[in-house]
Amino acid sequence: YINYKNMSHQHMLMMFNLLPVGSNISIWWNFGSMLLTCLVIQIMTGFFLAFHYTANINLAFSSIIHTSRDVPYGWIMQNTHAIGASLFFICIYIHIARGIYYGSYLNKEVWVSGTTLLILLMATAFFGYVLPWGQMSFWAATVITNLLTAIPYFGTTLTTWLWGGFAINDPTLTRFFALHFILPFTIISASSIHILLLHNEGSNNPLGSNSDID
């Protein structure tokens, strides 16, 4: 009698043991790859949602309801995109906490590129939050963009340019949709730089121990 299940289990363990990763890597090192997975999911679901979205203040909310109710599997895309955004932030905060705990901020290039990624992600999330153009979307767009007026000399001009007028209106929503669509591709570029810098410095080994010791 041959226990094929046990053999396949042992084979799988052997495959994982062949990976050049020492036991000094813990579960907290998973979140970087989880963030990349989140990014792929968000781009894929967002791409399909963009097919059915209308960047118009009178039609935006209706187009989202239409996606949820009438488009085949639209509700899955919409919910995955919304929940995926929350998961994205959970993962990135754990990822940052791990970096703070292990002193990864000492690796300045990787840390600065990561901080840039966080700012880009927060900007993308903000623009996406405004897109349904519900009551909270309107409030968020007004309050957050008004912060730009605090910039001396050209703050008011910058705010007017971002709004596309003297108040939040249709041009604002169009611009926010364009920015929400293009920023994830900027995040991909910044992530590539982050990963290149990461492997250049060997940030996966904060203790400085031999990765092949076991």
Curated annotation (Swiss-Prot):
Q: What does this protein do?
A: Component of the ubiquinol-cytochrome c reductase complex (complex III or cytochrome b-c1 complex) that is part of the mitochondrial respiratory chain. The b-c1 complex mediates electron transfer from ubiquinol to cytochrome c. Contributes to the generation of a proton gradient across the mitochondrial membrane that is then used for ATP synthesis.
- Highest taxon of the source? Eukaryota
Give the membrane topology.
Multi-pass membrane protein
Q: Where does heme b b562 bind?
A: 81, 180
Protein name listed in UniProt: Cytochrome b
Q: Which residues form a coiled coil?
A: none
Classification via InterPro entries = Cyt_b/b6_N, Cytb/b6-like_sf, Cytochrome_b_N_euk/bac, Di-haem_cyt_TM
Q: Which organism is it from?
A: Gloydius blomhoffii (Mamushi)
Which gene carries the instructions for this protein?
Answer: MT-CYB
Organism lineage reads as:
Eukaryota, Metazoa, Chordata, Craniata, Vertebrata
One Pfam family this chain carries? Cytochrome_B
